[in-house]
């Protein structure tokens, strides 16, 4: 593996955090390498007067080693006394729990936002508390929120925040379309475009292609930066054996007319040689039969183990990503 790499990863929450942990481990012995994560903010929302940033917080807690691995979100050893009190007062959403430790971050973030501090600067302040080994940048400082238009059997067609659709309804209401409100007027956060331009490797992580990666790419300027960077752009499939690894990406892909398959997602991103975003694409070993078709479409593809079962498998996958990027660069 080449040394002294500037690695940039586009990432969502749980899958992105586990992959980033692997990238950090893969380059740990190379003090000259840097890892930068450009993180989805489309899941963000206002709740009980506080600005909540689920994906940023999940990645922060995971890299800091203080996350709740069993739940996949929140702080380890969390209590929920304040959340219970809020619910007793009828404040917030009873189905969306705010942990007591988590609330500390939300209150600090909201206080700084009300003082006019940009979200990217706030993330720098929050991450300074722990040695993450990864630089986190929100995709934008502007408010962008993902909303879902659903078929509700009780009320008909209506729109709701993504968190309501996912957390309350467990994506059980059929999604008609996804809307990233505010994305057309958003600008990339400070450092985002420079990171992509100066990267040696850019990775589209194994996060939801629609509501995580799709939201990042929808911010004007970011997709163009991926097309124009001199770095190889490689991606990791979030689909294994025709099924999602975690979450609701299958329902999201169906809503935009993309099959839930590793090859379909790779071709959805497209090849840079044809105006798309990717040079290389990794699928799982169970999808090895898809590799020839992917390569026929112009993408360099490999089949490797994709399951992020533990830090070791995450690091092994990260090494495969960097190996593919090196081959694409040649």
In which residue ranges do the predicted regions lie?
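Extreme N-terminal starter segment of soluble prokaryotic enzymes
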Residues: 2-7
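C-terminal functional extensions of proteins
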Residues: 246-330
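A short, Lys/Arg-enriched amphipathic alpha-helix followed by its capping loop at the start of a domain
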Residues: 18-33
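Electropositive, gly/pro-rich neighborhoods at or near active sites that engage anionic ligands
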Residues: 29, 39-180
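Short Gly/Thr/Asp-enriched flexible loops that form oxyanion-binding sites at enzyme active sites
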Residues: 20-24, 212-226, 291-295
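Active-site glycine-rich loop that binds ribose-phosphate moieties when present
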Residues: 176-195
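A short helix->loop->beta-strand "cap" motif at the edges of active sites that frequently abuts
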Residues: 31-33, 229-233, 278, 299
